[in-house]
């Protein structure tokens, strides 16, 4: 058996990635979220495949087909809510995974980090297009508002929007292509995950101390397979609690009303995981400025390795940087809350202040805190 595991062309790839992989002996539970993201992706692909068997990508029947899945298909409601809430779990794990990378300085593994940023954008695009498919009020108006942002691009903007729509408004052509993209993108994500892991295994994992682990490695199996399984149990517990007790907790009631181009909902807002970026978009009165702020709120992750001024890799022994990190976390919670509120006083002002603070913390305050710590340590 050992020979097959180590010599078979396919098995030896699996073996070197998940069984005999040398891993740092001290990685904490914050390192569990990579495998949890893999589990979420698998869940989304499987549930999505079964949903696609019953869904019809047509403006006349899309809403009815989703209703049919929930009412008439065997356990269709479970599959549908697993898929919807699975997306929320995906983003929850994604945000924690990125946060862990920031806190422990994993962004110094630049290839892995950059592929991760591409993955984040791809997952966000997939989730956005998936939200359009049930063809409820929020699906339709969300698609209209977000695709319309591209019209802010000078000269080619309007043509670009109409090209994406496949007409002069969000209609049948838009829904059909969004379904096609929503189906193919998870497989592209799976391929990018392979690249992400390939780059990670070139350098090996970081650890909570931010030091080299070369002198102290342990095999991935059984130590971290068991540890990942424990994390998976907690994830399953949380997901199933959500699906079976309050499946619509994170959804929008407006999406239970069929799409109506003649009636705009009072508050157009995306799913909770996009609210922080939506708040940043809305906090700038200028359309192009808002779109740029929206893009840069995510793209800013790409320049974080360049802003790393500390002499230590991890924040484990840097209390000042830790404080800045948790202020940033709190700021993201505030932005998420503001994104779900109507555009009126005092929410506008709070949103603008939180947006300025978000960019200031990453671009100015964090590098300065690191420099102060260097001075305190006489480095």
UniProtKB/Swiss-Prot annotation:
Heme b b562 binds at residues 83, 182. GO terms for biological process: mitochondrial electron transport, ubiquinol to cytochrome c. InterPro entries: Cyt_b/b6_C, Cyt_b/b6_C_sf, Cyt_b/b6_N, Cytb/b6-like_sf, Cytochrome_b, Cytochrome_b_C_euk/bac, Cytochrome_b_N_euk/bac, Di-haem_cyt_TM. It is found in: Mitochondrion inner membrane. Its cofactor is heme b. Keywords: Electron transport, Heme, Iron, Membrane, Metal-binding, Mitochondrion, Mitochondrion inner membrane, Respiratory chain, Transmembrane, Transmembrane helix, Transport, Ubiquinone. GO terms for molecular function: metal ion binding; ubiquinol-cytochrome-c reductase activity. Binds 2 heme b groups non-covalently. Heme b b566 binds at residues 97, 196. It is a multi-pass membrane protein. The chain crosses the membrane at residues 33-53, 77-98, 113-133, 178-198, 226-246, 288-308, 320-340, 347-367. A ubiquinone binds at residue 201. Its main location: mitochondrion. GO terms for cellular component: mitochondrial inner membrane; respiratory chain complex III. The cytochrome bc1 complex contains 11 subunits: 3 respiratory subunits (MT-CYB, CYC1 and UQCRFS1), 2 core proteins (UQCRC1 and UQCRC2) and 6 low-molecular weight proteins (UQCRH/QCR6, UQCRB/QCR7, UQCRQ/QCR8, UQCR10/QCR9, UQCR11/QCR10 and a cleavage product of UQCRFS1). This cytochrome bc1 complex then forms a dimer. Belongs to the cytochrome b family. Component of the ubiquinol-cytochrome c reductase complex (complex III or cytochrome b-c1 complex) that is part of the mitochondrial respiratory chain. The b-c1 complex mediates electron transfer from ubiquinol to cytochrome c. Contributes to the generation of a proton gradient across the mitochondrial membrane that is then used for ATP synthesis. Heme 1 (or BL or b562) is low-potential and absorbs at about 562 nm, and heme 2 (or BH or b566) is high-potential and absorbs at about 566 nm. This is Cytochrome b. The lineage of its organism: Eukaryota, Metazoa, Chordata, Craniata, Vertebrata. The gene is MT-CYB.
